[in-house]
């Protein structure tokens, strides 16, 4: 693969070992503290998560972590992330994974600055007017979540799976 950059309006950075640039890239967007969101063990076993952490450490950006995002992400993980972001004063999300991880990070990003229940956005009770920035180290480019403002979350109580469009 040839390395290249595509911007539309999301900045996409393509190429081998580009995860090593993560720290420099998020620093460019003003990150002061990041929450890394990831799913299961593949990002750990492959060494990807360690390379991303090293990149952040090299530029001095502190971070906290939220793992265990599952396919068809659930609201309880979003609530957990919102609480942790507020406690840790996070100002940028970094999703390391595929669509479910990205959707979770986006939902958390919308929920952190909101004083109500983030689910209000999904049921049309509120509109997202402010959100944390979201960066992505993509592992599975299947859902398209990395290039859209949409996010799909399942509410465990009642098993509602709803989409929020244009965060």
Predicted stretch roles:
Residues 113-165:
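A glycine/threonine-rich phosphate-anchoring loop and its flanking beta-alpha core
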Residues 35-36, 92-94, 135:
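Conserved beta-strand elements of the Class I
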Residues 44-116, 125:
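N-terminal small/polar loop signature for handling phosphorylated ligands or for N-terminal nucleophile
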Residues 11, 62-64, 133:
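Conserved beta-strand segments of alpha/beta enzyme cores
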Residues 38-40, 68, 137-139:
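Cofactor-binding loop segments of dinucleotide-utilizing enzymes, especially the Rossmann-like FAD-
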